[in-house]
Amino acid sequence: MPNPSNRKGKHSAPGQVNVYAKSNEVIVKITGADTDGTFEVVEENCKPGFQSRAHYHIKAFETFYVFEGSADFQVGDELFHAGRGSCVHIPPGVPHQVTSKEGVRMLMIYSPAGTDGMFAAMHALTQEQLMDAELTRRIALLHDTVMIEQSKDGRGKGTILG
């Protein structure tokens, strides 16, 4: 049953949301707390050369919408090139990895919610801790995310954030 305290709309104006900028700028627009855990909305601005660590989500569906730039999405055995206006949807349990040579600005929707806390936890780490694959793997697992392996060229060594 919905929480009566969440019976209000929410406007996420620039600068009035949770912004995490360790490697990429991650902007949590709508949190799981805002939706009683139903979904969350996150904007991510990835720098040129971005490559996430391969991972999957245990319960969450993840949908990406590309606003600017482009990215390659390895989703299971399929590779999608997504440019401006593209949408990529990934069901729970499907391994995926995102790379972008030129940089990309995208919106991510997770349902159910659960990953927004991971961005805050990763942001609180030192640079040395971010490179600790075991530590970041444990943090990710607490937030519905299973890290699979290091990225092929050594990038994305610690976090889902690249």
Predicted regions and their residues:
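A short, N-terminal "cap"/entry segment at the start of jelly-roll beta-barrel domains
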Residues: 1-39, 124, 129-162
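Conserved short histidine dyad/triad with adjacent acidic residue
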Residues: 27-29, 42-57
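Ligand-binding loop in jelly-roll beta-barrel domains
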Residues: 35, 72, 92-117
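Short acidic-glycine-tyrosine-enriched beta hairpin
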Residues: 9-13, 17, 77-95
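A cytosolic small-molecule/anion-sensing beta-strand core signal
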Residues: 67-68, 83-84, 102
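A short, compositionally biased micro-patch
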Residues: 47-49, 59, 66, 91, ...
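A hydrophobic, small-residue-rich beta->alpha segment in the mid-to-C-terminal subdomain
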Residues: 105, 119-128
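Glycine- and acidic-residue-biased ligand/ion/polar-headgroup-sensing regions
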Residues: 59-71, 76
